[in-house]
Amino acid sequence: GTDINFVVLNNQTYRTKNLVCCNGSDALTMEFDLVICNLPYLATDEILDAATDGGKDGFEVPKKIFDSIYKNIKIGGKFLFVTSSLSDYQKLMDYAQKLGLSSRILAKKKMFFEELIIVEAKK
């Protein structure tokens, strides 16, 4: 697993091995069948919290993560990501398609003030 926040990696609820502190998958060279990401999707004017702030339209930071992860997805592999109705999730899906990934919504869950959306993007 990767995270940009070293403290988060060291304080997981469910401990695991092979953790890397990096942006997206910039430090990784291997390919994976499945990549799962809880994107920082909230639309914000400035990035104050790397865990939640996605920049303009909630797209700016996720785009960088997509660009980083794309090289690590095997042909036929899947990229599952969580996004929100508070962001421009269609813009994310369109960008995935621009990269050559076919995308579709797998699930939606209404919460108090937003709807969480799980998207599958397949290479």
Regions found by a protein language model. Name each.
Residues 13-14, 47-50, 92-94:
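Short amphipathic alpha-helical segments
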Residues 36-38, 97-98:
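Short, hinge-like loop/turn segments at secondary-structure boundaries
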Residues 61-120:
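Conserved Class I SAM-dependent methyltransferase catalytic core
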Residues 30-32, 47, 92, 116:
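Short, well-ordered secondary-structure micro-motifs
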Residues 39-64:
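Mobile active-site "lid"/loop adjacent to the S-adenosyl-L-methionine
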Residues 1-37, 43-44:
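Conserved SAM/SAH cofactor-binding pocket of Class I
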Residues 2, 55, 82:
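Active-site-adjacent beta-strand anchor residues
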